[in-house]
């Protein structure tokens, strides 16, 4: 019991000593309380849209500089080339007999109009008639056409089938008949023109040329 009392006394002394030491210090006052500012209310975060991905820039090619236009001169229309046709060499004729000159008659006879004067059984020169009908004579303009060239070859083949002594008379009669059918005119003018064309046709086919009229050089007509 006495020990308990001693312990309580010691505790009381220790407590009093501790309170005296605490209250009787340097006499400093405690610092005033610190006033903190009120809290700042931040705005809510702004949700930005996602970034837009733009396409890469298109690089245009540099402009093309065209050359200035070239002024082309108008085409020059050249005249058609002259007609060249092969001439066949004349065949040797077995002593041709002289034939009467058709231009000695101022007016054509009926046999000359029919193209059968002195021919007898000579075949009709149908291709030569077509040759003259298409105005394919050597003095006409469309003489160089392919149709005229074909008719010319066929006409020359038919002329070679005629006997030499009757060949010129046959072609003269055909030419004279064709002239009078196309352009009616006087018999003397038609006869001279037919003689000229007949000579050109025989030369064109490479055949023997007829003998000229004895009065043609003097320019007269026998009576």
Swiss-Prot record:
Per the record, its GO cellular-component terms are: aleurone grain membrane; vacuole
Pfam families xrefs:
Gliadin (PF13016)
Cellular localisation:
Vacuole, Aleurone grain membrane
Q: Does the keyword Repeat apply?
A: yes
Return the annotated region ranges for 8 X 6 AA tandem repeats of P-P-P-V-H-L.
Answer: 31-78
Question: Start-end of the sequence repeats?
Answer: 31-36, 37-42, 43-48, 49-54, 55-60, 61-66, 67-72, 73-78, 97-104, 105-112
| Record key words, sorted | Membrane, Repeat, Seed storage protein, Signal, Storage protein, Vacuole
- Domain of life of the organism encoding this protein: Eukaryota
Does the keyword Cell inner membrane feature in the UniProt annotation? no
According to the UniProt entry, its GO molecular function terms are: nutrient reservoir activity
Q: Which residues form the signal peptide?
A: 1-19
Record InterPro entries: Bifun_inhib/LTP/seed_sf, Bifunc_inhib/LTP/seed_store, Glia_glutenin, Glutelin
Function, as annotated, reads: Seed storage protein. It accounts for about 15% of the total endosperm protein content.
Entry similarity comment: Belongs to the gliadin/glutenin family.
Tell me the protein's name.
Glutelin-2
- What organism does this protein naturally occur in? Zea mays
